[in-house]
UniProtKB/Swiss-Prot annotation:
Molecular-function GO term, any one: DNA binding
Family: Belongs to the SfsA family.
One family name in Pfam for this protein: SfsA
InterPro entries: SfsA (IPR005224), SfsA_C (IPR040452), SfsA_N (IPR041465)
Domain of life: Bacteria
Gene name, Swiss-Prot/TrEMBL: sfsA
Official protein name in the record: Sugar fermentation stimulation protein homolog
Amino acid sequence: MQFDPPLQPAILLKRYKRFLADVVTPDGRELTLHCPNTGAMTGCAAPGDTVWYSTSDNAKRKYAHTWELTETQQGAVICVNTLRANSLAKEAISAGIIPELSGYNQLKSEVKYGEENSRIDIMLQADDRQNCYIEVKSVTLAEKEYGYFPDAVTTRGQKHLRELMAVAANGDRAVILFAVLHSAIDRFSPAHHIDARYAQLLTEAQDKGVEILAWKAELSTTRMTLNKPIAVVLNPGK
């Protein structure tokens, strides 16, 4: 995925109302950015961090600028735009980068499925194999070398795990793909300390045939690529 035109830098003043952030540009202008992230954004939004933003030419948008990346004062680069995770996953799958998800000739998005009124992020299909249902999650919470999901209690995420378990029980492939969008993360774990129920369900899902993958993105202000598998540790410390 390329940013064209390249992203522009600014210094974060504050994030507020979840969807807005005030920044100051190198030439001293103050801008309000759209923040496409409803999570806690722990460690991703400290005042004084450098943010990188894109600009839309859509005149109907109230806020023309979108917060894409954070460059923390500790040197980490983080993609805070959670909408990018699905696009990165689709690109990586289509390019054959993720071997576990290769061999399919059709890729569909936002397909209705399940018993809880859900839509799957990605469905892969081929004539010679069962359908593959893929739920994509964006990982930006870092503690030491670990990346954690979720960064807040997520009943929606719990629902998705229940739906994936039902898919696996019916004989199709069920995959949860954690897209790691933080340069300092080298392994993934569910956030037991934030949402114990989600962590419990993820372990249960694996036991019932749901495949768990974690892939890390290479991030820059000009392009992003999901290209590196990292270890999944369901119960760190045990």
